[in-house]
């Protein structure tokens, strides 16, 4: 009897901590966009880990392929949550053209052609969305946002946690495993970097509050370079987005890569393609030099290294697509996709409202980075003091100017009065 109980306890703990396997699936012809498929029992969900999303999405995977329009619940969501079973509340959905209609109940989605999707033990608050920028493809994303457009109490992760529909608000991405709930025991050491939820004015209102880490320096080239060889790119921010199989870099840093990489190690073998003032992509003729080139991203003094060989994809014509894009929007926002997510473990901790990164190395340049941070803080403090002093000087100058003007007015007024008295004619 006791042995049976111990076995049951062991199995319960194993099931509770068992990672949910996920696979990567190419979803368009360009083979640049990926989705993660999570299997929970007999159910399968497509999700996108998006650290800037302020809305948490749970997608539909059963939408028929001949549905050409997709719904975005953020435009139509008017009801309160959770659903009231007694009132049989529903959320009605319709796309912009009215071609597809549907409704969401507490545990059921109906979308087009009378199709009904049962969602056992899950709260369903969104369906596939429509991306107009990069072709028309269906994809769903589970956004690990902190706030929503409707207030903190409407956060799907928090709501699901309170209703035990999702066990925890902690997600761990570790190569091809996604953990829900407790952080894996082997991550009992301190994370190499962590960042709190921040408010970035670089993002739209819908995505403004999210897990955004600070990126201060990059090193381009050989691994034996020191912190002195790094390039200061602060204040830059990083988001993590599993839907993209590339690293997105703001256009403002294009010249840095041009001078340190493409006019140096890769001179003459790459061409640049600009797409409608939206982005710049890079195609190269050969990749023999890539294995000796590294990009080192310094976050909180820790270095996260990606070999340029891991940022390439061979095209059908034999040329090499470099998985780096320069985006014209968001001047300071970098986005790290699968090339980074595959190499490092990322913990999105909704209970502490932080993101933790594991696997970064700091021994080579953490001390120098710390000195740089102190130097920057000292310079900022000196700038604040200088601004304060200049402000005081300006205020004092304006004060004395006003006083001088008032004195001058008074003297001028006395002179006028004296002149009037002196020139006054005697009364007859």
Where on the chain are the PLM-derived regions?
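Aspartyl protease catalytic domain
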Residues: 16-30, 110-232, 316-327
């Amino acid at each position: 009897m006791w042995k049976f109980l111990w076995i049951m306890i062991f199995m319960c703990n194993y099931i509770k901590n068992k990672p949910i396997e996920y696979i990567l699936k190419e979803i368009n012809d360009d083979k640049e966009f990926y989705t993660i498929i999570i299997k929970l029992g007999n159910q399968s969900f497509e999700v996108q880990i998006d650290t800037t999303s302020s809305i948490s999405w749970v997608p539909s995977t059963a939408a028929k392929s001949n549905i050409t329009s997709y719904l975005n619940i953020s435009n139509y969501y008017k009801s309160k949550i959770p659903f009231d079973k007694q009132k049989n509340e529903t959320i009605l959905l319709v796309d912009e053209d009215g071609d597809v209609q549907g409704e969401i109940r507490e545990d059921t989605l109906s979308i087009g052609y009378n199709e009904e999707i049962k969602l056992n033990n899950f709260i369903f608050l969104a369906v596939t969305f429509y991306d107009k920028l990069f072709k028309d493809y269906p994809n769903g994303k589970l956004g690990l946002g902190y706030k929503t457009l409707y207030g903190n109490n409407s956060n799907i992760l928090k709501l699901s946690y309170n209703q035990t529909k999702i066990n925890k608000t902690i997600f761990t991405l570790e190569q091809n495993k996604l953990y829900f709930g407790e952080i894996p025991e082997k991550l009992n050491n301190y994370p190499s970097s962590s960042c709190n939820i921040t408010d970035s004015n670089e993002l739209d209102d819908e995505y403004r509050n999210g897990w955004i880490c600070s990126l201060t320096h990059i090193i381009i080239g050989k691994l034996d370079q020191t912190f002195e060889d790094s390039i200061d790119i602060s204040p830059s921010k990083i988001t993590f987005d599993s839907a993209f199989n590339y690293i997105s870099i703001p256009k403002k840093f294009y010249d840095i890569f041009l001078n340190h990489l493409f006019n140096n190690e890769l001179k003459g073998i790459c061409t640049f393609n600009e797409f409608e003032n939206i982005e710049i992509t890079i195609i190269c003729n050969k990749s023999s030099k890539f294995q000796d080139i590294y990009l080192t991203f310094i976050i909180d003094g820790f270095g996260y290294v990606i070999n340029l060989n891991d940022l390439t994809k061979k095209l059908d014509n034999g040329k090499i697509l470099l998985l780096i894009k320069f985006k014209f929007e968001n001047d300071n926002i970098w986005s790290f996709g699968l090339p980074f997510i595959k190499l490092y473990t990322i913990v999105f901790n909704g209970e502490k409202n932080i993101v933790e990164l594991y696997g970064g190395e700091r021994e080579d340049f953490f001390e120098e980075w710390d000195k740089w941070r102190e130097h920057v803080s000292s310079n900022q403090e000196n700038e604040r003091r200088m601004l304060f002093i200049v402000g005081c000087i300006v205020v004092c100058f304006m004060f004395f100017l006003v006083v001088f003007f008032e004195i001058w007015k008074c003297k001028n007024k006395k002179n006028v009065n004296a002149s009037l008295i002196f020139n006054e004619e005697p009364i007859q």
